[in-house]
Regions:
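C-terminal motif of bacterial Sec signal peptides marking the signal peptidase cleavage site
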Residues: 21-24
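N-terminal low-complexity, Pro/Thr-rich disordered segments
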Residues: 27-113
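Primary mode marks residue(s) on the alpha4-beta5-alpha5 output face of response regulator receiver
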Residues: 86-151, 155-277, 284-375
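Bacterial N-terminal signal peptides that target proteins for export
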Residues: 2-12
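Sec-dependent N-terminal signal peptides
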Residues: 13-17
């Protein structure tokens, strides 16, 4: 049968659709996360890495995504960081905030007087929330918004409503959360872990908010609706030069060996497998999201300060995830592949006042607070 232009166009369309759906939640290499575990806190365990103003783009990672170096659109309704909702955007697009609104929010934040430090708190700039798993689905409202079932499976905690159709405003409106602070309606997720095909849920997750910068005193809250990812879902091999993409053993006895495929540790019976993954803490001050969901964020540079391209210090979000696995770690995989494909997503929906108080009182004063934001 002779091929016709119409037939060739139809076949090409089907192939492109197939590629888009196969891409799932595949991430794009960019700003690295944590580099080493900490036995005490979730913050301060990652050495700042050299930032990049825009991570490399990959058209296969996000269907229809423009290059990370593309110029953000000048048009479109902006979002005010503290009161307005984040506007919807096509997968892979820039979301630009209102500059005047952000400037006003920043001025108001630094005008507030921090609460006097009482007692003798630990001199570490951080606060945290403790969370339990809420649900699983194959959605990703950051990378594949509105594409139900388009991703590999994820394990969610925090906001119970998170799905492909989630927006900043829908997250803030949803109640309750599986984290121990009712003021935090944010959504958090990672690829689901399996052992021989059965889901392995974390026993607990602690989300630390802190600063890895030399001077944390100028840290300010990230705006409502900011979203970001860290890690690389496409990475299936060890890359120690890029990020601390490793699981480790926490508890008495620690690591006693490696799994048969060498990708997971074997822990003593008195220890559990733990994974820490940390997000950048420098923001460009202009965008709630970027084409690759990383280019609007960066790590501090070698001086311990934010780079000129991303001059705004914001809290460094760090997940510390504990899994109920120790001696038997054979047959473990992630929904995204090997252990080295571990990545994480964060979608901010904190109540503005609650987040601002914690950042001003705890991070800016360089002291450790609990989940309620108290010393």
């Amino acid at each position: 049968m002779r091929s016709t232009p119409t037939l060739r166009r139809s076949v090409t369309t089907l192939l492109l659709v197939g590629v888009a759906f196969a891409g799932g939640c595949k991430d794009i290499p960019g700003t690295p996360g944590a580099s080493s575990p900490s036995s005490d806190t979730g913050i301060g365990s990652s050495d700042p890495q050299t930032p990049t103003s825009a991570a490399p783009s990959d058209a296969s990672a996000t269907p229809g995504a423009p290059s990370a170096s593309a110029t953000p659109p000048a048009s479109g309704k902006p979002a005010t960081p503290s009161t307005s909702t984040a506007p919807p955007t096509a997968s892979g697009g820039w979301i630009t905030i209102d500059p005047a609104g952000q400037a006003a929010a920043t001025k108001a934040f630094f005008a507030r007087k921090p609460k006097p430090v009482t007692g003798n708190p630990v001199k570490v700039p951080e606060f945290n929330v403790g969370c339990k798993v809420s649900h699983h689905n194959s959605d990703d409202p950051i990378v594949l918004p509105k594409l139900v079932g388009g991703s590999h499976n994820h394990t969610f905690w925090g906001n119970k409503s998170t799905d492909a159709n989630s927006t900043a405003e829908s997250l803030r409106a949803a109640k309750p959360t599986t984290c121990n602070s009712p003021d935090d309606q944010s959504a958090y997720w990672v690829p689901t872990m399996y052992q021989n095909g059965k889901v392995v849920d974390p026993t607990e997750v602690t989300v630390y908010y802190g600063s890895r910068l030399k001077d944390p005193s100028k840290t300010q809250p990230f705006p409502f609706g900011l979203r970001m990812i860290t890690g690389d879902a496409k990475n299936q091999v060890d890359t120690p030069d890029k990020q601390g993409n490793h699981f480790w053993c926490a508890g008495i006895g620690g690591e006693v060996g490696r799994s048969a495929d060498k990708t997971f540790p074997v822990c003593a019976k008195t220890a559990n497998i733990v994974r820490q993954i940390t997000f950048p803490d420098c923001w460009d001050g202009k965008h709630l999201d970027s084409p690759n969901h990383k280019a609007h964020m960066a790590n501090g540079d070698h001086t311990g300060a934010c780079p000129k391209s991303h001059p705004v210090p914001v809290p460094s979000v760090s997940f510390v995830i504990s899994y109920p696995l120790s001696a038997n770690t054979d047959g473990i995989t992630l929904a995204s592949g090997t252990s080295f494909s571990m990545h994480a997503d964060f979608f901010n929906a904190w109540k503005d006042e609650a987040l601002a108080a914690r950042v001003r009182n705890c991070l800016d004063q360089g002291v450790k607070c609990n989940s309620a934001g108290n010393f």
